[in-house]
Each structure stands twice: as C-alpha cells, then as structure tokens.
C-alpha cells in the first residue's frame, strides 16, 4: 500500500502527457510519433538540455529528439504525425477527396461577399484573420463555424426550381444555428418600364417542415429591383431542422412571381453563370464550458534548457494539402521541450496542474511520493481559423480548437 500513491501519481503524469494534447487518437498506439505541437521526447540524460528531473514517460532514453529545423527536411514520420493531428482537430477520418474543384468563379464570389478576401495571382486565397495565428477570442466559451455550400439542381418542377445543397454539420456535433441565408442572384434583362416605375417581384423559398417530410414551409420576400444583384433569404429554421434530423441534403424550391413578366431572371445552376451560382451560408455555434487559467510560459531562445515553447511553422503546401485547405497557407503549431526540475514548482506558469504542485511540495520537503517525474507539455492551447473543403465540397470556415501551442509547463 505504501507504493500505491507513487504508482498512481506516476500513471497520472503519463495520462496527462498523452491525453492532454494528442487527444483520443493517441490511444491507438502506445508510442505515437512526435507532432509539431506535441511535446517532443527529451534528450537522454547527459545530453544538452537533458536532466534527471525529466519525466521518463516523455520519451525514454534511447536517442534524443531531433528538432524539425535540425533535420534539414521533414521526414515521413513527422509529416504523418502532423497530418493525423490536423485531421483529428477537424474531426475528419481522412483528407477530403477533391476529385473536381468547385468552379473558381463561384468560390471567389462567395468569399468576397462574406470575408472581403482576395485571390492572389498564384491562385491562393488571402483572408484577414486567417493567417495561421491564434483566432481572435479563441479562448472564449463560444466557437462559431461558418459553412458555405453551393447549389446543384434537379431541374424544373411545375413553376418552381428545385435546388439542393449538401450542408455539413461539422462531425455531427450538437450545433445551434445562429443564422443561415440563401444567396440568390437576380439578373435584369432589357425591359421597357413606364417612367418612374420599378420592377417589383416576390420570391418564395420553400423548405421541408421539421417533423413533416411531406409538408413544406415557405419564406417570402418582396424585392424592389433597380439593377442586377445578390439578394439574401433567411433559412435558419430550415438548416436547424436539417441538423436535428441528422441529414445533410437540403432541398429548396424557389419560385419567383412576376419575374417572367418583368424580365427578371433568377440565376440558378448555369454553366455560363458560375460566378452567380446560388449558395447557402450557415453560421453555427458550439458552446464550450471549459475555462482555462492563463499562465506565463517561457519562450525557447537557445539560452535555456528549462521547459519552454519552441516556434515551428507547418506549411500546408509542404504536406500536399493546399488543394483542400484554402486558407491559411500554414500555421505555427509549435511544440514544447526542455527539462522540469523540482524547483520550478514555485515559478508562475510552470506547474500546470494541482497534481504537479502536490508532487513538487512533497519533494521540497524531502519526502518521496514515488518514482514520479515532471514532463514538459502544453499548458495553454488556442484555436485557429481555417477555411477548407469538406467531403461534400462545402467551403467550411471554423475556429479549430487546440491547434496552436501557446504556452508550455511542467506536469
């Protein structure tokens, strides 16, 4: 019984190391390869940066960790670890299979309308706040995702046009739809109007009512047209009902009263009008009740061997994922390295848990709770905004949690 607390605390240290950063995917392998954001295995005792206070569960003594910048190039194991981490954060089983791209004109139009972004000459997208750094307000309780889905059509049904969209609900999470809109372009053809008159039409958008698959609800909007342009129609109720049914396909029937008489043409799915293809924008919220305690952490500057944060940039082009990740072009994932001597218990931000503080207080008093050593691990993680294609060719914009290591500490 005397050894039980030590063994229990030792197990807690190991569990905290593995589960605290890598997440559930780490349990599939007893010795997962290091990732840029995960704490790398420390050097063996006696090597630079090594310490007898280093947690043995952090990496063992068989050869030191080679930093990415020391490799000259990133090896295959390192790349695979980075890929697994990104996919797990996006809740994807594998990279989306992009066999045919969304028409560039349609994508550019949607991005300009929603994000004031721009497309560079080399085809890359630049959007403010999607630069690979932490998202503004990333530590808040709410995370908002934005999903853009482009229309397909089943053709004409009586006086209505059937549009359908495949809308991802972000890994079947319990999302609450904050706002959802259909964007529809109305084009004016040459038409002789009486002096002082305008073209006024009524657009109706029909969607399936929740709980009644054979019943349709309708959103109506009177549109006063001066020129060709985009118009939005609220469909929040339709998207929320879709998510609650656990479905992905959204069917919308669009009808425009008086359009034909007034030479107004709603643009649907026309190969000659790709830049005006209809699209749906969904803003959804997922609450997060977790609170983080802000701590200060050390930055690795080449002059310290203590636990610190090492910056490291991950380039999506380097790993061959720039075809489905639209923005950013890469991000600072960072990782933790360094030793954790017992006296760090008194340094602000170095003790990352109550468990660590208790163990170190035992040590400072000359007591031995068991063979427990501290590990240098991430103590603060932040979200990052990403814009990417999913398997249904939706453009998804979301704040992805736990992507960037902000601070490191000992546990």
From Swiss-Prot:
What Gene Ontology terms for biological process does this UniProt record contain? activin receptor signaling pathway; apoptotic signaling pathway; cellular response to calcium ion; cellular response to cAMP; cellular response to cholesterol; cellular response to insulin stimulus; cellular response to interleukin-1; cellular response to leptin stimulus
Which is a Gene Ontology cellular component entry for this protein? Answer: extracellular space
Where in or outside the cell is it found? Secreted
Checking SMART domains in the record gives: TGFB (SM00204)
The phenotype of cells or organisms lacking this gene is: Inhbb deletion mutant mice are viable. However, the deficiency affects prenatal development with a defect in eyelid fusion at birth and female reproduction. At 2 months of age, Inhbb-deletion mice display 2-fold higher insulin serum levels compared with WT controls.
Listed Pfam families? TGF_beta, TGFb_propeptide
Q: Which CDD domains match?
A: TGF_beta_INHBB
Propiece residues: 29-296
What are the annotated disulfide bridges? Answer: 300-308, 307-376, 336-408, 340-410
* Tissue-by-tissue expression: Uterus, testis, ovary, lung, kidney, brain, CJ7 embryonic stem cells, and possibly in liver.
List the keywords (alphabetical): Cleavage on pair of basic residues, Disulfide bond, Glycoprotein, Growth factor, Hormone, Secreted, Signal
InterPro entries on file? Cystine-knot_cytokine, INHBB_C, TGF-b_C, TGF-b_propeptide, TGF-beta-rel, TGFb_CS
Q: What Gene Ontology terms describe what this protein does at the molecular function level?
A: growth factor activity; hormone activity; protein homodimerization activity
Task: State what this protein does.
Answer: Inhibins and activins inhibit and activate, respectively, the secretion of follitropin by the pituitary gland. Inhibins/activins are involved in regulating a number of diverse functions such as hypothalamic and pituitary hormone secretion, gonadal hormone secretion, germ cell development and maturation, erythroid differentiation, insulin secretion, nerve cell survival, embryonic axial development or bone growth, depending on their subunit composition. Inhibins appear to oppose the functions of activins. Activin B is a dimer of alpha and beta-B that plays a role in several essential biological processes including embryonic development, stem cell maintenance and differentiation, haematopoiesis, cell proliferation and wound healing. Signals through type I receptor ACVR1C, abundantly expressed in pancreatic beta cells, and type II receptors like ACVR2A. Upon ligand binding, these receptors phosphorylate intracellular signaling mediators SMAD2 and SMAD3, which form a complex with SMAD4, translocate to the nucleus, and regulate gene expression.
What name appears for this protein in its UniProt entry?
Inhibin beta B chain
Origin species: Mus musculus
């Amino acid at each position: 019984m005397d050894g039980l607390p030590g063994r229990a605390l030792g197990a807690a240290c190991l569990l905290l190391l593995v589960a605290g950063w890598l997440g559930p995917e780490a349990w599939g392998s007893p010795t997962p390869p290091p990732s840029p954001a995960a704490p790398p295995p420390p050097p063996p005792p006696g090597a630079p940066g090594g310490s007898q206070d280093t947690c043995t569960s952090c990496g063992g003594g068989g050869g030191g960790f080679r930093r990415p910048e020391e490799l000259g190039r990133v090896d295959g194991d390192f790349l695979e670890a980075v890929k697994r981490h990104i996919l797990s954060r996006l809740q994807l089983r594998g990279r989306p299979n992009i066999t045919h791209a969304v028409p560039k004109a349609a994508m550019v139009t949607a991005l300009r309308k929603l994000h004031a972004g721009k497309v560079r000459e080399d085809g890359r997208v630049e959007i403010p706040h999607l630069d690979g750094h932490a998202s503004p307000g990333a530590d808040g309780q709410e995370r908002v995702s934005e999903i853009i889905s482009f229309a397909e059509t089943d053709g004409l049904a009586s006086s209505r046009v059937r549009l359908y969209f495949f809308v991802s609900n972000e890994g079947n999470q319990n999302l609450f739809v904050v706002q959802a809109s259909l964007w529809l372009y109305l084009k004016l053809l040459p038409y002789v109007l009486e002096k002082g008159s305008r073209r006024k039409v009524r657009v109706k958008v029909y969607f399936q009512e929740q709980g009644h698959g054979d019943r349709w609800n309708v959103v109506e909007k009177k549109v006063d047209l001066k020129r060709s342009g985009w118009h939005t129609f609220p469909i929040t109720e339709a998207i929320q009902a879709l998510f609650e049914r656990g479905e992905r396909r959204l069917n919308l029937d669009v009808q425009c009263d008086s359009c034909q008489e007034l030479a107004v043409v709603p643009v649907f799915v026309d190969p000659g009008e790709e830049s005006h293809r209809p699209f749906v924008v969904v803003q959804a919220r997922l609450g997060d009740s977790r609170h983080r305690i802000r701590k200060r952490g050390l930055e690795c500057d080449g002059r310290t061997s203590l636990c610190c944060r090492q910056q490291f940039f991950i380039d999506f082009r380097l790993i061959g994922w720039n075809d489905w990740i639209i923005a950013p072009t890469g991000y600072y994932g960072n990782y933790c390295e360094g030793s954790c001597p017992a006296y760090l218990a008194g340094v602000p931000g170095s003790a990352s848990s109550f468990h660590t503080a208790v163990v170190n207080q035992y040590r400072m008093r000359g007591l031995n709770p068991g063979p427990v050593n501290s590990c240098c691990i991430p103590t603060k993680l932040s979200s990052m905004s990403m814009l990417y294609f999913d398997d249904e060719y939706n453009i998804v914009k979301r704040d992805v949690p736990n992507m960037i290591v902000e601070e490191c500490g000992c546990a």
